[in-house]
Amino acid sequence: MAVKKYKPYTPSRRFMSVVDSSDITAKPSVRKLLVKLPARAGRNNQGRITSRHREAGAKKLYRIIDFKRNKYGVPGRVATIEYDPYRNCRIALVVYRDGDKRYIIQPSGLKVGDTVEAAEAGLDVLPGNAMKLKNIPVGTLVHNIEMKPGKGGQLARSAGAYAQIMGREDKYVILRLPSGEMRKILGECMATIGVVGNEEYANIVIGKAGRNRHRGIRPQTRGSAMNPVDHPHGGGEGKTGPSGHPVTPWGMPTKGYKTRRKKPSDKLIISRRKK
């Protein structure tokens, strides 16, 4: 895949770029794997904004992805590589030998006609195969990693993401996560071998505000451009900065201030992420 650029026939097209979509082989064909999700637009069940700068965006259907990879011992063939509007990586439709069809995240190098399988142990270290962490060799790059056995993959699922198995300690496996954090995860958790595909996504340039509106992202207003009633940075004659450490609209320090609460799982973190 490559990044496609456009001729600057309008100002917004000058720097705009997209990822080449020649790897997509088909449109969605399995209706039972498509569902309509309600457009929350950043609102909670009371209709109040709990996540600012969000809107519905373009109309789209959610693809049900197999994050658990719990179909053990049944080989499956990759039938199609498809676009997913809800994520920045591609998805692969796998047709299993027993006729079952499931979507998985497409690892880099996985193509139509390839065979993938999930098992507790004993599989080849090939992109798309899934095993328990304790049975994957040290040094292997993995993605779609569970944090609790049977819950489904939660870590390293976006385009180009991966974690590396660094070692083992008792019932835990030591992973280096995409952020650089070193963390212990139970060896009973499942993970998929390989790097998530569509790595070039990180290099695209949105180019114009309209593309972000289609993605459901609304404009952000600076606090210093508001009135004092709306934001702690608001008001003043002319352009004035914050009188002290920058804060959120609710007075919480921001821009580098640590807000993460301590959790019992902190003991599993060997070293924090690199900034």
From Swiss-Prot:
SUPFAM superfamilies the UniProt entry points to: Nucleic acid-binding proteins, Translation proteins SH3-like domain
SMART domains: Ribosomal_L2, Ribosomal_L2_C
One term of GO molecular function: transferase activity
Biased composition (Basic residues): 257-275
Keywords: Ribonucleoprotein, Ribosomal protein, RNA-binding, rRNA-binding
GO cellular component: large ribosomal subunit
Region described as Disordered: 212-275
Stretches that traverse the bilayer: none
HAMAP family, per database record: Ribosomal_uL2_B
PANTHER family tied to this protein: LARGE RIBOSOMAL SUBUNIT PROTEIN UL2M, RIBOSOMAL PROTEIN L2
NCBIfam families in alphabetical order: rplB_bact
Family per similarity comment: Belongs to the universal ribosomal protein uL2 family.
Name the UniProt record assigns to this protein: Large ribosomal subunit protein uL2
Organism: Nitratiruptor sp. (strain SB155-2)
Lineage, opening ranks: Bacteria, Pseudomonadati, Campylobacterota, Epsilonproteobacteria, Nautiliales
Gene name as annotated: rplB
